[in-house]
């Protein structure tokens, strides 16, 4: 274990359903700072790097339910799919996740660090190059990345393209739209 770098300490934390803010490294650090009466400094983020104009060249975003989704951020990029760096694969492995590729692994890493679920869409799989954030239609179905089929109703927020749901908003991306 020591030779391949799998000897780090892992803390397994059970979080109750009413504390989703603690489902990340940042959330646990914030809670620990409060408990230990220490100052918490959140990690810096830089959203100024998002280039909305370049994204619009590739994909249109149509948010149809601003009450359930007041903001939707997307970045389009041409990226070569390849293995993630070893340090990232090790951290994902320590958290019980297997490395898949650089794109999927980054979304999982962000989830672990800040608790924000994300899904990387395969551009070729998005019909009419439009992402629509809307409520599901009664009877619509989706097969997310866990490969189980779900029947949806109007109370569920989905990320869709022009023809079908491609993700369950904030939960899991669709198998039909993921990076392969």
Mark where each language-model region is.
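Phosphate-rich ligand and nucleic-acid binding surfaces
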Residues: 1-180
């Amino acid at each position: 274990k020591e030779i391949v770098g799998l000897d780090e300490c892992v803390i397994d934390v059970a979080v109750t359903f009413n504390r989703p803010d603690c489902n990340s490294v940042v959330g646990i650090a914030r809670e620990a700072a409060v408990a230990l009466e220490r100052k918490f400094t959140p990690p810096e983020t830089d959203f100024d790097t998002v280039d909305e104009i370049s994204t619009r060249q590739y994909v249109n975003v149509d948010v149809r339910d601003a009450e359930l989704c007041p903001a939707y951020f997307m970045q389009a990029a041409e990226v070569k799919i390849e293995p993630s760096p070893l340090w990232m694969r090790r951290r994902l492995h320590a958290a019980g996740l297997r490395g898949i590729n650089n794109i999927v692994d980054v979304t999982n890493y962000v989830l672990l660090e800040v608790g924000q679920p994300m899904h990387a869409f395969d551009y070729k799989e998005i019909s009419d190059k439009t992402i629509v954030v809307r409520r599901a239609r009664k009877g619509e179905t989706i097969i997310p990345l866990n490969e189980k089929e779900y029947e949806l109703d109007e109370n569920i927020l989905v990320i869709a393209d022009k023809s079908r749901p491609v993700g369950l908003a904030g939960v899991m991306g669709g198998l039909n739209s993921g990076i392969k």
